[in-house]
A protein has these predicted regions:
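Lectin-type carbohydrate-recognition ectodomains
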Residues: 1-467
Length: 467
């Protein structure tokens, strides 16, 4: 059942109770029909034992709008949480779904008490609730998401150790070096309840050596450990050097890389939450446990027009803006599976007083990190008047449009903007929001040491890479 303290659980007395069960692999499709005041019915389709399973209808339809939210399980997408608004004892007024890749529109009307069904690092595999002429309440079944184990890389020898994967994040890493290489690695974690875990040391603390400055990771500020570069000696079987990268910074190279074979632990879209490996007098090899990184929806500020949502992509390649006194049209060129995909919102107006400006990024060596905008608010509707774009290379576009007094900012520290959503009509852009996702710093950006390694975005395959 839901593990969130704000969950709107089985508290209603009215309506017929229903239960889809908890023996599914995943949720695949959700159909919602809404009326003037509340959600009328919901239907959920699942995958069970690898086969599609059609769900039952819960509630009653008396006309109204129908929306469908599809989850692509074949691409490792899964349902993380459900949020919405309700009138306790009566009905659910609005509902919204979030996966590990994207967030649906809010379906319905945002009146009443807010509720949330979520459980940290778990996914939804089933629902239950009650309904008659309306959906009256909703609760969810959760199952844990098993972290992926990346096999240990480095030299041979030593005794096996394993810190496990039952952690929320890595918070501090410190190494001691001697003439052979890494003498020990000291690791600090935060558990799933947010409490500091026991410090773990692997290797030897005896004999001469030099303890280096620790590398600290601020998990409270949404900093995540994303990748590790290591170098080992094939003869001695000892790791010679290590370097760590988060979505915000890169450590100095800890050790000697002059005579070592390189390996990398990383996986696109994942963070490292635990370690295992082999060690005795020195650190011989290092492996990791990884889990999915969080996707954040940066909400738009404003109202008017029609809702649109591009979803998420690998990155943004180009932005084109058409404007005069207002932003008339915005065009995004995204990268999806290595191919370019274009989305246009508004109409490309070619008139004497309409200007066009474009901003091109050097993808995959550069990504979009922030959008600043200004807007006016005539007659209760917002209209965007200017936009400015910033990148991971510390480049800023020219202002596109004419600045006004009210402003907004779409930005999340250490993250790239990988998709957009908003409000528009054929002749105005009313509001703009974005999706943000943690990304590895690129070469030359926020380095702590000029001798840092190759940098760049992580590899596409989830595994260990030897060079």
């Amino acid at each position: 059942m839901s593990g969130d303290s704000n969950a709107f659980g089985m508290t209603q007395r009215e309506g017929t109770k229903w239960d889809d069960g908890c023996d599914h692999d995943d949720v695949t499709k959700i159909y919602v029909v809404g009326g003037k005041y509340y959600i009328q019915f919901i239907k959920i389709d699942y995958v069970k034992s690898g086969q599609p399973k059609n769900g039952s209808f819960h509630g009653d339809s008396n006309g109204g709008y129908m929306l469908m939210f599809e989850i692509n399980n074949l691409k490792n997408e899964y349902l993380e949480s459900v949020e919405g608004y309700c009138n306790p004892g009566r009905c659910i007024n609005a509902i919204q779904f979030k996966t590990n890749f994207r967030v649906s529109d809010m379906m319905g009307y945002t009146t009443g008490d807010k509720f949330k069904l979520a459980s940290h690092r778990k996914k939804i595999i089933g629902f239950q609730g009650s309904a008659d002429n309306a959906l009256k309440d909703l609760d969810a079944y959760f199952t844990s998401i098993t972290p992926t184990r990346m096999e240990a890389q480095g030299g041979k020898g030593g005794k096996e150790w394993d810190d496990g994967a039952d952690n929320d994040s890595v918070t501090k890493i410190q190494v001691r070096i001697n003439t052979k290489g890494i003498q020990y690695i000291k690791l600090n974690y935060v558990d799933k309840d947010g409490h500091p875990g026991k410090e773990q040391i692997h290797g030897s603390e005896t004999g001469p050596g030099n303890k280096l400055e620790p590398f600290e990771i601020n998990h409270i500020d949404k900093e995540y450990l994303l990748s590790i570069d290591g170098y080992y000696d094939e003869v001695s079987g000892v790791i010679k050097a290590l370097q760590f990268k988060t979505n915000i910074k890169t450590s100095e190279v800890m050790g000697d890389v002059e005579k070592g074979t390189k390996f990398t632990l990383e996986c696109t879209g994942h963070e490292i939450i635990g370690f295992h490996g082999f060690a005795q007098d020195n650190l011989n090899s290092l492996g990791a446990y990884i889990t999915n990184l969080p996707l954040t929806k940066l909400e738009y500020k404003g109202c008017g027009g029609n809702i649109w949502d591009d979803g998420t992509f690998q990155g943004v390649k180009k932005v084109c803006v058409y404007f005069n006194d207002l932003i008339r049209c915005i065009e995004f060129e995204y990268i999806n599976g290595g191919k370019e995909e274009t989305r246009v919102h508004g109409m490309k107006i070619f008139m004497d007083d309409v200007s066009k400006k474009e901003f091109v990024l050097d993808y995959p060596n550069e990504y979009l990190t922030a959008v600043e905008g200004t807007y006016i608010n005539p007659y209760g509707y917002t209209k965007i008047t200017s936009l400015t774009f910033k990148t991971s290379r510390n480049r800023t576009s020219l202002r596109m449009g004419n600045a006004s007094n009210s402003s907004f900012l779409l930005e999340s520290k250490g993250c790239a903007l990988v998709g957009f959503h908003g409000l528009s009509t054929t002749d105005h852009l009313y509001a703009l929001g974005a999706y943000s996702f943690p990304m590895t710093p690129l070469p030359g950006v926020k380095k702590l040491d000029t001798q840092a390694g190759d940098g760049g975005v992580p590899q596409d395959d989830c595994g260990s890479h030897g060079v």
